[in-house]
Amino acid sequence: MDIIICKDEQEVGKAAAALIAPFATKGGTLGLATGSSPLSTYQELIRMYEAGEVSFKNCKAFLLDEYVGLTRDDENSYFKTIRKEFTDHIDIVDEEVYSPDGANPDPYEAAAEYEAKIAAESVDVQILGIGGNGHIAFNEPSSSLSGLTKVQALHPKTVEDNARFFNTIEEVPTHALTQGLGTLSRAQNIVLVATGEGKADAIRGTVEGPVTASCPGSILQMHNNATIIVDEAAASKLENADHYRLMEQLKLR
């Protein structure tokens, strides 16, 4: 696991984009996350695309998750969100951006179908954020560390947190389709980004805590090619922060 500590959110985005861009140029398969954490990364990748530094025209992309009951064109679907925040601004083919089928009346069937589709591909680089409690995608604490794509009932706090995107809290879906931690772990490379003091406990658990379902992010300690990129605030509770900075400086380029 590589730990990169950056000055601020913008620098986090630049560092993450620099790792991801070579895979895009090669026409790789990307794993995309939504939420606030990867926004600076997407903004930097868009800037690089507009500057002619990278192309996504031969890429495929898989989203982490989707609300059960929402169509892809629903304004609150994650597929719609990733289009607004990223894929509509680059040259990736829209039909090559895949997400779980939240509109399938049988969500368990949708989960199995999405798992099979991902298994048929090899995700070259997976972009991840992390929740304040260490959750990745909708894999909350106590999720199986080897779990596959599944239907996940949303924690009441998650419903409350996401209510700001809907007209009323009653409109927030109560379930989501999400890649499991076992699914995510099959990605060839993982880049997790986190910023802000609110993520400091989760980053400490992910990097320096035991590998445990109590902190889903800790599964990345078992991955051969995981990179954690954080700002100073998110790194503020790491006991070995100075060591990580030194290791990054001494890395052979």
From Swiss-Prot:
It catalyses: alpha-D-glucosamine 6-phosphate + H2O = beta-D-fructose 6-phosphate + NH4(+). Signal peptide: none annotated. GO terms for molecular function: glucosamine-6-phosphate deaminase activity; identical protein binding. It holds the Pfam family Glucosamine_iso. It is an enzyme of class 3 (hydrolase). Its EC number is 3.5.99.6. It comes from the Bacteria. GO terms for cellular component: cytoplasm. Belongs to the glucosamine/galactosamine-6-phosphate isomerase family. NagB subfamily. HAMAP family: GlcN6P_deamin. It comes from Corynebacterium glutamicum (strain R). Pathway: Amino-sugar metabolism; N-acetylneuraminate degradation; D-fructose 6-phosphate from N-acetylneuraminate: step 5/5. InterPro entries: Glc/Gal-6P_isomerase, Glucosamine6P_isomerase, NagB/RpiA_transferase-like. Gene3D superfamilies: 3.40.50.1360. The active site is at D65, N133, H135, E140. Keywords: Carbohydrate metabolism, Hydrolase. Catalyzes the reversible isomerization-deamination of glucosamine 6-phosphate (GlcN6P) to form fructose 6-phosphate (Fru6P) and ammonium ion. This is Glucosamine-6-phosphate deaminase. GO terms for biological process: carbohydrate metabolic process; glucosamine catabolic process; N-acetylglucosamine catabolic process; N-acetylneuraminate catabolic process.
